[in-house]
Amino acid sequence: MSPRQLNFLSAFSLSVAIAVVYHQAWGIAVAQPILPSEAVETGVISNGISINLFQAFVLGFIQGATEFLPISSTAHLKAVPMALGWGDPGVAFTAVIQLGSIGAVFWYFWEDLTGIAKGIIKAVQTRQYDSLEFKLGLGIGLGTIPIVFFGLLMKLLVQDLDNSFFRSLSTIAIASIVMALLLALAEKLGTHRRPFEKLRWQDGLIMGTAQALALIPGVSRSGSTLTAGLFINLERAAAARFSFLLGIPAITIAGLVELKGLLDKNLSNDAILPLIVGTISSAVFSYLAIAWLIKFLQKRSTWIFVWYRLIFGVVILTALGMGFGT
């Protein structure tokens, strides 16, 4: 069996396994609560949806497991809960539990981040701007501008983002398929030879521009930046590593803005507790996903994610065609 066939079978098996696990988990949760009654209290958090602690934990798992894999966490946080009958948790809940993912990035890349901070300070003091740390810091800063600009623009122009076309299942499916094809093209055309130590600040701007596409659910922030990194010939693991660092400002800003918006609504304890559970769950599973992906990409290609995204998009379109989710 060829590596590509193996990747396809692995992606297909993963898709089926995830669907079965979610289906079984939902069936168990409905038939017989796993948590004590006092632990499944619900509170309206965002988008008019009540989320209990079990659901918050599962949503945190989905966020953590998919945020740093090039398969779109936003798409899965929209599609999976709807498939389970929970409803769309909304932009606010999704953005807040992403703070757990950012905590995982700080946890995993603490030495890199402190090195970048020290490098920037030293470069400013000595006026020598050719160090890798300064280039990384500058690249992250410049690369954050596009997504912040277009994110603010979208917030101004789209009044009800939760129920807009941008968060529709059809948009998610099409975006997933298109990005799968682009990732496949990047795998084919990229040389995958440029190491992390050869990163330039211009790479941050290029990958940051690609990151802005992730405002469309289904595109995937890590997927778009990883794809851009492969197109500019970075090693797979190097592209992933910089992608994670690049996402820190954007995800943090989005999470804090939505958190402030929720806190301004004077949420009850029943609503705050699921946010805490979801964020902690997201942090733990994000850390595991980061560690796994970097190790995986040191030896393997991204074809498994190409096939997964194709299958994911086709399954959603098929389900919509059969009348589900409408």
Curated annotation (Swiss-Prot):
Q: Does the keyword Ubl conjugation apply?
A: no
Q: Which reaction does it catalyse?
A: di-trans,octa-cis-undecaprenyl diphosphate + H2O = di-trans,octa-cis-undecaprenyl phosphate + phosphate + H(+)
Q: Which residues cross the membrane?
A: 11-31, 42-62, 90-110, 138-158, 165-185, 212-232, 242-262, 272-292, 304-324
Q: Which UniProt keywords apply?
A: Antibiotic resistance, Cell inner membrane, Cell membrane, Cell shape, Cell wall biogenesis/degradation, Hydrolase, Membrane, Peptidoglycan synthesis, Transmembrane, Transmembrane helix
- Primary place of residence? membrane
Enzyme's top EC category: hydrolase
> GO molecular function terms here?
undecaprenyl-diphosphatase activity
Topology relative to the lipid bilayer, per the entry, is:
Multi-pass membrane protein
Query: Under which EC number(s) is this enzyme classified?
Result: 3.6.1.27
- Residues spanning the signal sequence: none
Provide the Gene Ontology terms for cellular component.
plasma membrane
**InterPro entries with a match to the protein in the record:** UppP
The miscellaneous comment for this protein is:
Bacitracin is thought to be involved in the inhibition of peptidoglycan synthesis by sequestering undecaprenyl diphosphate, thereby reducing the pool of lipid carrier available.
Similarity comment: family membership: Belongs to the UppP family.
What functional role does this protein have? Catalyzes the dephosphorylation of undecaprenyl diphosphate (UPP). Confers resistance to bacitracin.
Q: What is this protein called?
A: Undecaprenyl-diphosphatase
